[in-house]
């Protein structure tokens, strides 16, 4: 795109102020999301790694001498009423339809997720809700992404969808970080993850009470993160649309706004 540049130095400074305000807000939103992700990880670690989830009296379980028992499959002590399961028992795993790169365009509204996260945009989506998608081909095998609602997930990623939809999928996203995903990777030439190899991964299975309680606590963090990402997209689009209009003089800046 050819953009005609403003020659007036004061106008250039005003334009820079406006664009800088967009960049600052976008950076702030990304920082908020980083903090939200860190909080979600910390919560999982505290409850499901250190086992200091709230017991029946609201006290941290393990620190309050909650009974622990050895689990042979997980090779560790876990709370007495907890057990193990496999990824395939609690999740549906599948690879959706792949899109050709020629069909993607930055002008389309819906994000497309592949092996390396967002790979472009498309005019349709194949998943209504936010999903957990794992890269299953190439050097990025095992990398996890939370997709945005109304996104297209390609066959280069494995969708990992909890069968029990009363449980927030942040649980499985965090649990997979502690599973032996690397050991499930196969392929002598190009690394790959198959559904069969992933389905047998051992996962900790907390009590239903704790899973539901965890979901209630973590859901607002996930919702906030998704909303921040939507605002980042909106601000980025506005900035990119506004830039050429400002530079060629089609849009002018109110001097009161430029001084804010």
Regions found by a protein language model. Give the residues of each.
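DNA target-recognition domains and sequence-specific DNA-contacting regions of bacterial/archaeal
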Residues: 1-6, 55-206, 255-260
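Non-catalytic DNA-recognition/assembly elements of restriction-modification systems
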Residues: 4-46, 65-114, 210-254
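Alpha-helical scaffold segments that mediate packing/assembly in large oligomeric complexes
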Residues: 42, 46-62
